[in-house]
C-alpha cells in the first residue's frame, strides 16, 4: 500500500505539471502573435482544457483504452461511455499497483488536451472561434484516442511485427505531438495564411509578435511541464527510470536550443531568439518517444538534430506558403517524426527492424490523421466556414469574436 501511495502521488504531481503546460502554451502563443488577438488565444486554450477533459471523460478514455471490448480487433474498440473502474476494480492491482484508475484518467486527459492546443497555435489570428471549437472537439473526440489506442491501448501498433517487435513511443512524440501537428498542417492548408504574411511574389514577410519576453516565459514553463509529461510516462516513481528520463529530457531540450540557434546563425547570420526557443521545444518533442531508452549522449544528438529540423522546417513551410505563427508544426510534427524514428537509430531499441516499424507506424498514423483531419476540416468549413473576413482580421479577433480588448485602453502601435 505504501508503494502504491508513493507511485500515485508522483503521478498526481506529474499530472499537475502537464496541466501547467497549458499556461506555457498560452504564454508562447500570446507572445508570438499580435496584441489584438490575445483574448482569442486565451479563450481557445481555456476551451481546449475544459472541452478536452469532458470529452475524454465521456468517451475518449474508453475509446483509447477499450480493454477487451474490440469492435475491429486491434484497430478500434470502445469500453462504453463515462468513467467506471468496474466491479472487479482493485487499486492495489490496477496498473501493477502503480497508480489508481482515477489518476490514470486525469493524467491521460491532460495529454488529450495537448493535441488540440497544438492546432490552436498554428491557426492563430485568422480562424473563426466557432470553427476552431468544432474542429478541436472532433479531433480530440475521434482522431487522438483512436491513434493512441493503437499502441497505448494495446492495439496493432504494440505488436506490429510480433509480441517482441512493436512500435515504441514512450510519451507521445507521434501519438500526441505528431497527431496534433498533422491536424494543424491540414487546417492551415485549408485556412490560408494571415493577411500580409506573403507579398505578391510569395516572399514571406515578418509579422512580429507582441511580447517576446512572455513567449520566453512560456517556453520555460513548458520545459518545466515536460518533467511531468515524460517523468509521468514512466507510470511509477521508480527512482532510476524517472531520473534517467528527466536527464535525457533536459539534455535534449538544451541541445535542441543550441542546435537551432547555431544553425540559424549559419543560415541567416542572425541569433534568432524565437528559433532558439522553438529549438528547445523541438528537442523536448524529439526525446519524448525514447526518453527512457536513451543514454545522455544519444539524447544530445536527438536534441541537436531536432534543433536543425526546426530551422529547416520553418523554411519549408515558408516555401510552401503555409503560415504557422508560433512554429507549432516544425516543433510538434517534424520533430515528433524525427524523435520517433530516432528510437530505431539510437538507444536500447536501435536496429533496422525497429527503425522500419517506427517508420511504418509514423506513416500509418500520419495518413489516418490527414484523412480524418481533412474530413473534419471540410465538414466544419461547409457548415460554419473557417476564416474570419479581412475586416475582422484587421481589427483583431479580440474585438471581432469577443467584443473586447485584452489590455483596455493600453495599446502598442
Label each region the model flagged.
Residues 1-413:
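Hydrophobic alpha-helical transmembrane bundles of multi-pass membrane proteins
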Amino acid at each position: 500500500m505504501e508503494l502504491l501511495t508513493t507511485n500515485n502521488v508522483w503521478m498526481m504531481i506529474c499530472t499537475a505539471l502537464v496541466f501547467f503546460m497549458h499556461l506555457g502554451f498560452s504564454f508562447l502563443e500570446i507572445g508570438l502573435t499580435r496584441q489584438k488577438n490575445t483574448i482569442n488565444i486565451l479563450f481557445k486554450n481555456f476551451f481546449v482544457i475544459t472541452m478536452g477533459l469532458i470529452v475524454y471523460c465521456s468517451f475518449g478514455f474508453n475509446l483509447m483504452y477499450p480493454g477487451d471490448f474490440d469492435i475491429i480487433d486491434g484497430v478500434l474498440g470502445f469500453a462504453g461511455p463515462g468513467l467506471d473502474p468496474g466491479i472487479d476494480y482493485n487499486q492495489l492491482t490496477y496498473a501493477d499497483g502503480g497508480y489508481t484508475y482515477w489518476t490514470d484518467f486525469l493524467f491521460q486527459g491532460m495529454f488529450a488536451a495537448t493535441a488540440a492546443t497544438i492546432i490552436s497555435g498554428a491557426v492563430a489570428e485568422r480562424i473563426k472561434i466557432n470553427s476552431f471549437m468544432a474542429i478541436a472537439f472532433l479531433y480530440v473526440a475521434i482522431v487522438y484516442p483512436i491513434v493512441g489506442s493503437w499502441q497505448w491501448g494495446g492495439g496493432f501498433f504494440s505488436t506490429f511485427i510480433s509480441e517482441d517487435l512493436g512500435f515504441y513511443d514512450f510519451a507521445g512524440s507521434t501519438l500526441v505531438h505528431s497527431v496534433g501537428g498533422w491536424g494543424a498542417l491540414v487546417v492551415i492548408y485549408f485556412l490560408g495564411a494571415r493577411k500580409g504574411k506573403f507579398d505578391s511574389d510569395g516572399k514571406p514577410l515578418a509579422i512580429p509578435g507582441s511580447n517576446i519576453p512572455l513567449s520566453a516565459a512560456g517556453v520555460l514553463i513548458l520545459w518545466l511541464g515536460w518533467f511531468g509529461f515524460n517523468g509521468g510516462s514512466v507510470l511509477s516513481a521508480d527512482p532510476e527510470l524517472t531520473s534517467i528520463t528527466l536527464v535525457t529530457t533536459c539534455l535534449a531540450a538544451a541541445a535542441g536550443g543550441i542546435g537551432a540557434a547555431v544553425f540559424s546563425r549559419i543560415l541567416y547570420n542572425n541569433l534568432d531568439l524565437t528559433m532558439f526557443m522553438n529549438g528547445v521545444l523541438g528537442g523536448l518533442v524529439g526525446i519524448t518517444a525514447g526518453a527512457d531508452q536513451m543514454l545522455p549522449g544519444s539524447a544530445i544528438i536527438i536534441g541537436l538534430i531536432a534543433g536543425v529540423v526546426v530551422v529547416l522546417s520553418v523554411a519549408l513551410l515558408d516555401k510552401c506558403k503555409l503560415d504557422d505563427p508560433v512554429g507549432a508544426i516544425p516543433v510538434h510534427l517534424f520533430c515528433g517524426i524525427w524523435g520517433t524514428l530516432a528510437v530505431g537509430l539510437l538507444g536500447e531499441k536501435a536496429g533496422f527492424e525497429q527503425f522500419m516499424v517506427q517508420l511504418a507506424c509514423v506513416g500509418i498514423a500520419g495518413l489516418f490523421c490527414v484523412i480524418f483531419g481533412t474530413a473534419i476540416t471540410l465538414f466544419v468549413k461547409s457548415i460554419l466556414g473557417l476564416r474570419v473576413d479581412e475586416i475582422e482580421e484587421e481589427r483583431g479577433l479580440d474585438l471581432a469574436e469577443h467584443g473586447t480588448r485584452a489590455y483596455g485602453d493600453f495599446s502598442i502601435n
